[in-house]
Amino acid sequence: MTEGIEGLPKLYRELADWWPVLSTPEDYAEEAAFYQELLVSTCSFVPQTLLELGSGGGNNASHLKQHFRMTLVDLSPGMLQVSQALNPECEHIQGDMRTARLGRQFDAVFIHDAIVYMTSEADLRSAIRTAYVHCRPGGAAVFAPDHTQENFKEETDHGGHDRGNRAMRYLEWAIDPDPQDDTYLFLMVYLLRQGSGQIECVLDKHICGLFSQDQWLRWISQAGFEAHAVPFVHSEFGPGSCDVFVGHKPLTAKD
């Protein structure tokens, strides 16, 4: 991952205020329910507090906040601003999931697909370590990458929404130009229209990490969690299409 805000894709910098047009909270209802049930079933107690690292525009949080008292951390000021408008009752903190240290622990920690921007072993292990440090003993952490090496397939998708006087349409293409390395490319083309004005076309390149299930489980375990993989269950995804990684922090953990 390129260091700092300047290394983020355009979607999280100059286009951040277009996020609500690209992606709506309603799109996240089903998967947020899956994550909520997984967090609750993994914890040794009924979790009350949840830290989300890489919380983005807050769409998952808009559902999870019905069940947890949430603190949301993201590197992008623009995305935090979008999330604050959607989730004013949640605490928002600007920070990097690799290095953030809030000085307190939470019953559970959640990292959604923002984890894919960890493009090296060092970056991913740092993010997992952040989750461990902030997780209360007996609590749970859930990591939800879009792909592992075992299930990656080249794919395309398209969609968009109208919102107020803005409209967006997009095309996305996930490809792996070099299967020998630990990254893949997620290319996005946005067509943006404001009011009755001209349509602007923007290309945005996302470089994403691609690791094996064994690497995920090993690094989560080495951080101190009891680790296992869980098939992601969603009506729009076939069985075995992707995995979610879960860490349970032992009740006897000292850190």
Question: Where are these predicted regions, by residue range?
Answer:
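Conserved class I S-adenosyl-L-methionine
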Residues: 1-48
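Class I SAM-dependent methyltransferase SAM/SAH-binding core
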Residues: 51, 57-100
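A short acidic, Gly/Pro-enriched loop at the edge of an enzyme's catalytic core
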Residues: 98-109
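A short glycine-rich, Lys/Arg-flanked "PGG" loop and its adjoining helix->strand segment in the class I
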Residues: 125-137
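SAM-dependent methyltransferase
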Residues: 142-214
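C-terminal lobe and adjacent flexible extensions of AdoMet/dcAdoMet transferase-like proteins
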Residues: 207-255
